[in-house]
Amino acid sequence: VYAGIAGSHIKGFNSHGVIAVKGGEVSPRDIERALDAAKAVAIPLDREVIHILPQEYIVDDQRGIADPMGMAGVRLEVKVHIVTGAVTSAQNIVRSCHKSGLDVSDIVLESLASAKAVLTEEEREIGVALIDLGGGTCDIAIFANDSIKHTGVLALGGQNLTNDIAFGLRTPMAAAEKIKIKHGAAIAEMVRPDEYIEVPSVGGREPRRLSRQVLAE
């Protein structure tokens, strides 16, 4: 199986590598050497590389090359996006899978897996930002020219919205979660002013009627 990884420990950054092409024609070995040069960056011992994602290759002065194999040139440069994560987090994911009787072929950043599932090639080409809102984190992946430009994780998720609803409406957490799912709206203008919802109170008090627009705002 392929196991997904996410969380606030995930970090992404851009790097590049440059090599001299041997023989005047780009070979698989040249591409491998360029990628090795790009990933030759200092990474803390408690982190590991999850992905090295090529953004573009440059052969001499030709930019924007997706696959330089077989091209003539003397200088090969590659720009990459490197994703790293905590070693212990990756190990715990693998161990959990093994305990369930599953063999892990590889670990994949969840936002990249989501992008493969929901984004079209055209969207990735013209530029798009994928935002995956989870319970505790918000995963972000930005694409342009059909390559990854940025990945990031915000320590904010659906649970934060639930907490805000519970605090703002003085209602239990379980009730706040149900209200969010059933009545939540991201744009207040899309809610009719005559829409009302029932909000349970804490401490056994009577439930209250509240405008749905107040919730959306």
Ranges and model annotations:
Residues V1-L130, S147-K149, L169-E217:
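Nucleotide/phosphate-binding catalytic cleft detector across ATP-hydrolyzing
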Residues I126-G168:
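Glycine-rich phosphate-binding loop of actin/hexokinase-like ATP-binding domains
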